[in-house]
C-alpha cells in the first residue's frame, strides 16, 4: 500500500526470478511465503506476471493462514491486474479479499481493487462502510485518485468519521474537489480550529493554502500560525505563502506570540479538550479514534 501511506516491506526476496518465487509461495514456512509474495510485488510493479503466477498468488491471497502473506499477495495481484491477469483470477481473488477477517488485508484489497477496476466506483464506495478506519481511509484515497470522490463525500467524512486517518485524507483531497470553494474553506477552517489530531489540522492548512481565498488566509493566520503543533505551524506558514504567492521566508509567522483567541484545541490558547466547538464529540468533528494500536500501525 505504498501510495496509501502504508509501508510495504519490499526487498526481502533473495531472488527476482519469477519462477522461483512462484514455487516459494508453496513453502511450509510463513516467512518464505511472505517474502515470495513481496518479491512478486516488486516484479508486478515493474511489469506483468505470468498467468500461473497470478493463479498461485490468488490462492495465497484467499487461503493462506498468515494475514501477512494474504496482504502482500493481494498487493501483487492489484499490480498484476493492471496487465494480463490470467482470465480474471486476480480480480476474483481481490474481491474475495475485500471480505477478509483481517483489517490490513481488506485495506490492501481496496487499493488493489482501485487498480484492477478503477471504474468500479460501487465497490470502493461500499468500503466506506467497513468497520476498520484503515479500510475506509484507503477507500477515500482510492475514490479520490480515480476521480470518483466529491465535495459532499469528503465533507461528510471530515464531519462524521471517527478515524483520524480518514479525516486526514478527506481534508487533503477536498482542495481537489472543491466545487463550492467558500463552503470547502469553511469546512477546512473548522478543521484547523477544532480538530484534535495535529496531522489532520496540517492537511487542512495545506488545502486552505491551495484554495487561497481571503477567508482561507484568515483561518491560517488565526489558527494555523498559532497552533501548538510545530508541524501544523510549519504547514500553515507554507500554505499562507502559497496563498499569497510568496516565499515562505517572507511570512512573518509570529510563532512565538500567544495564540489568537478562539484557537480551538490545537492553538496555544485553547489547551482544553473541550475548547470552542472542539474536542472529542464536539460539533462537526468526530474526534475519537478506532481501529488498531500504534504498535499495529507501525508493524505495517
What are these regions (language model features)?
Residues 1-79, 226, 233-300:
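N-terminal alpha-helical scaffold/docking segments in eukaryotic complex subunits
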Residues 92-98, 103, 107, 137, ...:
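Extended, compositionally biased low-complexity polar/Lys-Gly-rich tracts
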Residues 28-30, 65-66, 101-102, 131-132, ...:
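Short inter-helical turns and helix N-cap capping residues of alpha-solenoid HEAT/ARM repeat scaffolds
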Residues 59, 136, 162-166, 177, ...:
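Short amphipathic alpha-helical patches
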Residues 12-25, 45-63, 82-99, 117-129, ...:
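Amphipathic alpha-helical scaffolding segments comprising HEAT/armadillo-like alpha-solenoid repeats
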Residues 1-13, 31-48, 68-85, 104-118, ...:
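Structural detector for internal amphipathic alpha-helices that build alpha-solenoid repeat scaffolds
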